[in-house]
Every structure is written in structure tokens, then in C-alpha cells.
Amino acid sequence: MEFDRMLIRYGELSTKGKNRKQFVTKLAQNVKRAMTDLPEVRIHGERDRMYIILNGADYQLAEERLKPIFGIQSFSPAVRVNLDVEEVKAAALALVQDAHEENGTFKVAARRSHREFPLDSNEINQEIGAYVLQNMEDLTVNVKNPDVKLTIDVRKEGVFLSCRTILGAAGLPVGSSGRAMLMLSGGIDSPVAGYLAQKRGVEIEAVHFHSPPYTSEQAKQKAIDLAAKLAKYSGQVQMHIVPFTEIQEVIKQQIPESVIMTVTRRMMLRITDELRRKRNGLAIVNGESLGQVASQTLESMLAINAVTATPIIRPVVSMDKNEIIQIAQKIDTYNLSVQPFEDCCTIFTPPSPKTKPKLDKIEHYESFTDFDALIAKALDNIETISVNVAETAQVKDEFADLF
């Protein structure tokens, strides 16, 4: 069957009242980004649904692009015919023949919003159903639990027919809740945190700390590949790669071993927060899970968070590791995350890090080093790349060129 469009039904957008238009616009933008390799498609958004006009594009490829996009409750491959009963009959028969299995069951579910069509909803159900039955001997009607449900939507602009409903990713369109910076390591937790933030409409920009020669190019590429996995939910993710070697070396030389990790995380957070400010972000997202490691106790979080007043969103904070792993497997980041390339969070890790660091002592230790200058230098040399849904990354520019 040759489908000519995809019919998209909204999720939580239906509850957004006066803000509905901006949600629909954001969803349309995300769909367009996801369809960059299908330039022939056209997107038409309405108040209660959206259409993707395929113009000859492969509907199965379009279907795969739509599945991960947040803000879509469900969607259906569909065909449009003129407001003519005979055309509706022909299209209905072709759709059911394509979708049914031997000795299967079906039902017709019609809705008529265009009152000038000669049949009302019940008459459409009866006439189209009878026509299909007359032309398919091995088919029977089951109105409660059919194998094939033929939906017919009669509108002023035409009649739309479909036989299959595919569940979407639900949630809110990415970007509808503002922008945040995702602290993206090469581990399991932070990509899951990024995924969950996107599901609630947050546009993420990834921040990755790279410390050559202690961390390899493979570790950097792994982080880029993880960002590409997240890009499929919005079409594109901006990624900022921070040169962090010098700061880590100074921390190792100047800071007591037991609090190296606390100070390291504080410097990461300061850099991320400055990036957030320059990029007009509203929050910082990370993959911290309470009590999982020494830097993720409440006492450690308090000492680390003291460097900023920016909201820190921790989507996985209450999850067990197995729960996080299950989501990582679902979104296809787990196998990447467990690749054995060391990232900057694991180098220089002391054997017995403090789990209850004191903020006043941390600030005292830091006072002997000009970390402001080191942070400014790192910010001046950030590399920014654009990671898109097709899992390609291109160097966009140096960070200084953005401002």
C-alpha cells in the first residue's frame, strides 16, 4: 500500500490551553529536524493533529524518524482521498487488504467533521464495512477487539483513512520547557538523565570534559556517539568539549587527595554554569544518583552545588543502578557507555574520597590557587560541535566565535 502522509496525534499538548500553538510549533520544528534526510516531505500542523505529506518519501523511514520524537502520542500511515464515497470505498478496501491476515477480523471507525459529506458517521461505518465484507470472503466483523481497525476521518479538505496506529514517545516537545546544559560523561547515568530531561521538553546542550593524554580520543568519540543517540529525540544536540587537563593536573598538585573529586566536580560545575549563562540556559542536568558514589552523597552535593545558584536537575537521583541500566538499554546507550575508555571522572580518583566534605575546608583549599584564570582559559578553548540525528558530528566553530 502506498501511503501519502503520516497522521500525528499530540500527547500532553492537548492540555496546554493558550500555550498550545507554541507547543505545536516546537513539535513541528523537531519533526522537521528529524526528517533532514527526507527533503521532499512537508509538515502541516493543526490545532488537534499534524500531517506529514510524504511526496513520495519512504513512509517506513519516516515512521522510524517519528518514533522517538517527544510530544507525539501516536501516529498512523494514512491516505487521503476526495470527498467521494466511491473513492473512500476503494481506498478502504485496499487498506484492509494490505493489513489483514487470513480469517481475520475488522471494524470501521468513522468520524465526520465535514457536515456536507453525504453520509454521517454511522452510515459511513455501515456502508464502507459492507463494501469491504462483500469483497473479502475470509474477513469478519469484531467491533470490540478487531485485528484491523480502519479509521476514517471526513474533513473539509478530504477523507483520511488509516489502518495502523503506532505509539509515539509521548512527553513534551523538546525545547518547549527551555534549555539546559547536560553534563555528559562517558558513563551510563548521564545519557539516561539527558533522555529523561528531553522527555519533559528540555532542550539539552551536552558538556563533555576531555583531559588528554589521560583520556583518549576514543573516550571523546564515545561521548559524541552518546550525544548522537540523544539527538534522535530532538533532531540535533549541540555539544561543548571542554579541555580539562590543566585544571585536573593543578587540582592533583594543590588539593588534598581526599577531596580531589569534590573540587574537580566544583570546577566542572562552574564551567558548565558559565556555559549555561552564555548559551541562555535555565538549568544544569546531570546523572547523579543519590549515594551511588562518594561525590553523590547529600553532603557532597551540598559542597559541590555551592558554586552556583542555578537549578540542578537530577532525573535519576532516586533510581537504583539496575533501573538506570534498563532505560540505557531501551534508548540504546548502554553498549556505548560500557566501552572501556577512561573519562576524566575516573582519573586521579583517590582510594578513599571523603563522602562528607566540609564546604568551609573545600573553599579554604581552593583559595591558594587561581582557579578563575584556569576556568577562563578552558572556556576560551572549548570546541563546539553539532551532533545530528543521522549520527554525524561536524565541528561548528571554536567557542570564542560564538560571542
Swiss-Prot record:
Transmembrane segments: none annotated. The keyword RNA-binding applies. One of its GO terms (cellular component) is cytosol. It is an enzyme of class 2 (transferase). It is found in: Cytoplasm. ATP binds at residues 183-184, 208-209, 265, 287, 296. Its EC number is 2.8.1.4. PROSITE patterns: THUMP (PS51165). Residues 60-165 form the THUMP domain. Disulfide bonds: none annotated. It comes from the Bacteria. Pathway: Cofactor biosynthesis; thiamine diphosphate biosynthesis. Its main location: cytoplasm. InterPro entries: Rossmann-like_a/b/a_fold, ThiI_AANH, ThiI_fer, ThiI_N, THUMP_dom, THUMP_ThiI, tRNA_STrfase, tRNA_sulfurtransferase_ThiI. It catalyses: [ThiI sulfur-carrier protein]-S-sulfanyl-L-cysteine + a uridine in tRNA + 2 reduced [2Fe-2S]-[ferredoxin] + ATP + H(+) = [ThiI sulfur-carrier protein]-L-cysteine + a 4-thiouridine in tRNA + 2 oxidized [2Fe-2S]-[ferredoxin] + AMP + diphosphate; [ThiS sulfur-carrier protein]-C-terminal Gly-Gly-AMP + S-sulfanyl-L-cysteinyl-[cysteine desulfurase] + AH2 = [ThiS sulfur-carrier protein]-C-terminal-Gly-aminoethanethioate + L-cysteinyl-[cysteine desulfurase] + A + AMP + 2 H(+). GO terms for biological process: thiamine biosynthetic process; thiamine diphosphate biosynthetic process; thiazole biosynthetic process; tRNA 4-thiouridine biosynthesis. Keywords: ATP-binding, Cytoplasm, Nucleotide-binding, RNA-binding, Thiamine biosynthesis, Transferase, tRNA-binding. GO terms for molecular function: ATP binding; CCA tRNA nucleotidyltransferase activity; tRNA binding; tRNA-uracil-4 sulfurtransferase activity. NCBIfam families: tRNA uracil 4-sulfurtransferase ThiI. Belongs to the ThiI family. Catalyzes the ATP-dependent transfer of a sulfur to tRNA to produce 4-thiouridine in position 8 of tRNAs, which functions as a near-UV photosensor. Also catalyzes the transfer of sulfur to the sulfur carrier protein ThiS, forming ThiS-thiocarboxylate. This is a step in the synthesis of thiazole, in the thiamine biosynthesis pathway. The sulfur is donated as persulfide by IscS. This is Probable tRNA sulfurtransferase. It comes from Listeria monocytogenes serovar 1/2a (strain ATCC BAA-679 / EGD-e). The gene is thiI.
